[in-house]
Structure formats: C-alpha cells, structure tokens
Amino acid sequence: MSQSICSTGLRWLWLVVVVLIIDLGSKYLILQNFALGDTVPLFPSLNLHYARNYGAAFSFLADSGGWQRWFFAGIAIGISVTLVVMMYRSKATQKLNNIAYALIIGGALGNLFDRLWHGFVVDMIDFYVGDWHFATFNLADTAICVGAALIVLEGFLPSKAKKQ
C-alpha cells in the first residue's frame, strides 16, 4: 500500500532545496567576485578565501590524477539515494533524523554539482586562530557536518524524543 509523501520523511525535501540554493548561491558569488586565492577578512578569525578543492574533506586525494572526481561523485550519489530511501521509510514526524538527512543530501548535491560542473569544489570559508588555519570549506560542508552531528545527537536522546 502506498503512503502519502507528506506522511513520510520526504516531506522534508524542501530543506534540500534551501541548502542547495544557499550553497550554490554563495559559490556563485565567490566565482563572480573573487580570483583564485583572493582573501577578504570578515571578522577576527574568519575570512572569505576562494580555494579550489579537487579532493574530499581536507583535500583528501586532491593530487590523485583526476579519478577521485568520479569516485567522490559516485559516493555523493550513493549517499543521497540511500538517504532519500531512508526518508521515504521514516515518518514525517521524525523531524531530527529527516532534517539531518536533508542537510546531508543538500550538502552532498551542492558539492556534487561543483565536481561535475567545474571539476573541483569551490571552498570559501577560512577559519583561523593566529597563524593556524583550519581547512577551507563551504556551506555544503557545513550542512553535511551539521546533519551528521544531528544523527549522532539523535543516538543519545531518550527513545521518546526520537519518536517526535
């Protein structure tokens, strides 16, 4: 028996669209207004800095000859499809999990678009303390990390809170 999409976690797919719009919009603004390597200070310890990432998080496999572009694209597609299926199988009232899944899907698709369109991921957020700089990242990465943190948080909540 089929169920209404609004009664499933797919009801939260609108959040994927929001993440994509914000992520791709921010990357578009960077590409239109920055040359590669340009930096603009925003606040103490936070810069906008245009960088290209040919690998994964922390530029993992960035210098691997190009095959990693397709490898990470495949991972993004696989994870996104898996999470959409999980959203379909969950109730719309399971907000925390569905929000987490939507954030991860939105971030994965934002970076997937970059990999397929540009051949690299556009990064622009440079957090630093003194001379130490964290790896440059983007809003898609942030959405993925927040989504993953919500999944971990959900694991620590009492079962009554999980059902809501």
Curated annotation (Swiss-Prot):
Q: Name one Pfam family in it.
A: Peptidase_A8
Q: Which family does it belong to?
A: Belongs to the peptidase A8 family.
Query: Keywords, A to Z?
Result: Aspartyl protease, Cell inner membrane, Cell membrane, Hydrolase, Membrane, Protease, Transmembrane, Transmembrane helix
Q: What does this protein do?
A: This protein specifically catalyzes the removal of signal peptides from prolipoproteins.
Top-level taxonomic group: Bacteria
CC per GO annotation = plasma membrane
Q: What's the chief localization of this chain?
A: membrane
Q: Which HAMAP family match?
A: LspA (MF_00161)
- The record's active-site residues are 123, 141
Q: Where are the transmembrane segments?
A: 12-32, 70-90, 102-122, 137-157
PROSITE patterns, per the entry: SPASE_II
EC annotation from Swiss-Prot or TrEMBL: 3.4.23.36
The Gene Ontology biological process terms listed for this entry are: proteolysis
| Catalytic activity annotation | Release of signal peptides from bacterial membrane prolipoproteins. Hydrolyzes -Xaa-Yaa-Zaa-|-(S,diacylglyceryl)Cys-, in which Xaa is hydrophobic (preferably Leu), and Yaa (Ala or Ser) and Zaa (Gly or Ala) have small, neutral side chains
Encoding gene (name): lspA
This chain belongs to the protein called Lipoprotein signal peptidase
Transmembrane listed as a keyword: yes
Q: Where in the cell is it found?
A: Cell inner membrane
What lineage does UniProt assign to this protein's organism? Bacteria, Pseudomonadati, Pseudomonadota, Gammaproteobacteria, Enterobacterales
The protein's matches in NCBIfam families, at most eight in alphabetical order, are given as: lspA (TIGR00077)
Care to name a GO molecular-function term for this sequence? aspartic-type endopeptidase activity
Membrane topology value: Multi-pass membrane protein
Which pathway is it part of?
Protein modification; lipoprotein biosynthesis (signal peptide cleavage)
Supply the source organism for this entry: Escherichia coli O157:H7
